């Protein structure tokens, strides 16, 4: 029966999709209940597994993904007679399953296999800090559950589509469907390889470099606040907005005030972006962090606080968009101001944390202390932030002193 290999391949791929789509689902929430102290042997074991993961398992995973892609003939969109080597597909799929299982076992053994010190007492553990393990778990989960498992599913769909096309070769719709599935599968392959490379880089990079990655991603995500502002700052979309009949007769005052308040967010967005780009793009040899003495608590706070600021600004802007769409006035000025006070405190604490973990390293070309350069930079940002905050409070109160220009 010529369809038997197809059935076997589809069944195996579906089985692996179901298995690996649930992989690591408890990894992020599991806690080790062991009470023994971490030993030198434990550390050696963890470091050995991390080395194996970096130098053997992850490179082999990339090779196996490429092999499965090749056996599925993903790069050939012109072949009108889709004839897959299903024996090779079965072999490559089995190899991919084995390496995934080894990687998951390795990560679980490293992160959960023996107790670690608390987040405030792991500064001496180098690659075995909870901060790094948390990133490793998160990225591995995304790789396995949201990418490689989908590769199994899409591969199964492709084989089924090719089988259907072989049974009805005159139907052009089958060819179109095969091309669509190939394109989607190839995208998953490329993304899986990128994520595998990201895991390898995570194992090689210092704590500071990993925090810089988080900062840079956060800086790029801040555009979401400006995109929300466009909803209330673009007159062309006003005709499509809802109108609350109880607030139509306001001569546009409600929306005009909301637009002014929304625009007063712009300086904060710019200042946060400046801060994040400054510290995320400075080369590590010029970024004088005491990286080997930072524990997980400090690293978590450094990477998390900018995200907290952007999330808070996004929520506030979403509230303004809702008011604008329904033509409602801003009634909770005090609460919004209180929220901005919290954002300001987080901004200050982030700047202070960065300065606190700097050490005085000299720049040979300028003969200046990097600590002082960063310190002055943060002082300037703080002054501009408070000017923007004063301007914001004036605007949200519904008035601005005469001849005062908005801060941007």
Regions found by a protein language model. Name each.
Residues 207-408:
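Extended, alpha-helical interaction "stalks"
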Residues 1-231, 348, 352, 363-408:
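Leu/Val/Ala/Ile-rich N-terminal alpha-helices, chiefly Sec-type signal peptides and the beginnings
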